[in-house]
Amino acid sequence: MPRRRVVAKREALPDPKFGDVTLAKFMNHVMISGKKSVAERIVYGALDVVKTKLNRDPLEVFSEALENIAPLVEVKSRRVGGATYQVPVEVRASRRSALAMRWLVDYSRKRSEKSMPQRLAGELIDASQGKGAAVKKREDVHRMAEANKAFSHFRF
């Protein structure tokens, strides 16, 4: 246990265009090598594409997508007497959103569209409709937790 005091978590500043804190955090996940302006251009471009394709509020689509991607349970490795068990544990709210954002960005980068805003928009639209690679990742994580339910008594 650390002897020092617990450092308070800093709140992210809301993004300049929509004034949304979650979107600002998402931009930080998209950002590579500290290039915030590039990340902003990518995210805002993707939201514009979503707006033209679906004729809906892009922030609504974004929040739906994150909700559909965020995992409720995950497995953690726990070593008990020489054997390693995959123990299902509930995911904290902060980690849920962080994982959802990370998976959304990762699977957007793997898509085949031309530009990053188009890839991100495609993954956002798919995720908001309950399909796409990021949603599949969540289902896989849930399936692993369900398969290892027998080891849930090995709590952390």
UniProtKB/Swiss-Prot annotation:
The alphabetical list of record keywords is: Ribonucleoprotein, Ribosomal protein, RNA-binding, rRNA-binding, tRNA-binding
Molecular function via GO: rRNA binding; structural constituent of ribosome; tRNA binding
Recorded hits in Gene3D superfamilies, A to Z, give: Ribosomal protein S7 domain (1.10.455.10)
Matching PROSITE patterns: RIBOSOMAL_S7 (PS00052)
Q: InterPro entries this protein is in?
A: Ribosomal_uS7, Ribosomal_uS7_bac/org-type, Ribosomal_uS7_CS, Ribosomal_uS7_dom, Ribosomal_uS7_dom_sf
Kindly state one GO CC term assigned in the UniProt record: small ribosomal subunit
Q: Name one Pfam family in it.
A: Ribosomal_S7
Task: Provide the GO biological process annotations.
Answer: translation
Membrane-spanning ranges = none
HAMAP family hit by this protein = Ribosomal_uS7_B (MF_00480_B)
Family to which the UniProt record says this protein belongs: Belongs to the universal ribosomal protein uS7 family.
**NCBIfam families xref list:** rpsG_bact
Q: Summarize the protein's role.
A: One of the primary rRNA binding proteins, it binds directly to 16S rRNA where it nucleates assembly of the head domain of the 30S subunit. Is located at the subunit interface close to the decoding center, probably blocks exit of the E-site tRNA.
Oligomeric state and partners?
Part of the 30S ribosomal subunit. Contacts proteins S9 and S11.
Protein name stated in the entry: Small ribosomal subunit protein uS7
Source species of the chain: Cellvibrio japonicus (strain Ueda107) (Pseudomonas fluorescens subsp. cellulosa)
